[in-house]
Amino acid sequence: MTALSEQAVDYNLLKNRFRGFFPVIIDVETAGFNAQTDALLELAAITLKMDENGLLVPDEKCHFHIQPFEGANINPESLKFNGIDIDNPLRGAISENVAMSELFKMVRHGQKKADCQRSVIVAHNATFDQSFVMAAAERTKIKRNPFHPFSIFDTATLSGFMFGQTVLVKGCQVANISFDGKKAHSALYDAERTAELFCYMVNHLKKLGGFPHVAINS
């Protein structure tokens, strides 16, 4: 790319910031670590947009409590960790099929609005969340999965690079983002904090003059 064409790119447009990718924050709570056998119990997603100053900010969100799929493994230790009572009727849990359909609908709408080509999962320790989303998509056989099959943005890695901290609460503390440990392991709360952290890192790099990148001659 020539210097002239580089200057012509408007990086205040989301479609140009991540090479056509539409970033979507995801957080899941599960009944174990194996996406193929263990139940997906809760999912939250937050789309992002550029504001009038070209800064990345949260946009739309969705949040679902999900019924274990038929034959799913339920690990009691996982339920003790995330505090989910799968038998509580007040959960208002819905089927994986409905949850994934609504998730994909929201993501495709945001992706189209931003004129992006593909969506990418942004999560803390993202391979875990991605594995459960993809496994649920495969089980429900919903067509037109908007997410890239393997590319991800992992905020644990990015936070380690930016701040030397890989734990979500630690990264938030460095970025001066409030974090209530009592609310942690709620998919929606963790997704909201992850969205704030990701936006902070992207915007901070821009404010420092690190993006768009200009190579330094050695």
From Swiss-Prot:
Pfam families registered for this protein in UniProt: RNase_T
SMART domains: EXOIII (SM00479)
Annotated SUPFAM superfamilies: Ribonuclease H-like
Cellular component terms (Gene Ontology): cytosol
Classification via CDD domains: RNaseT (cd06134)
Annotated Exonuclease domain residues: 24-198
Record text on cofactor binding: Binds two Mg(2+) per subunit. The active form of the enzyme binds two Mg(2+) ions in its active site. The first Mg(2+) forms only one salt bridge with the protein.
MF (Gene Ontology): 3'-5' exonuclease activity; magnesium ion binding; nucleic acid binding; RNA exonuclease activity, producing 5'-phosphomonoesters
Site feature location: Important for substrate binding and specificity: 33, 81, 128, 150
Active-site residues per Swiss-Prot or TrEMBL entry: 185
PANTHER family (UniProt xref): DNA POLYMERASE III SUBUNIT EPSILON, RIBONUCLEASE T
The protein's name: Ribonuclease T
Species this chain originates from: Histophilus somni (strain 129Pt)
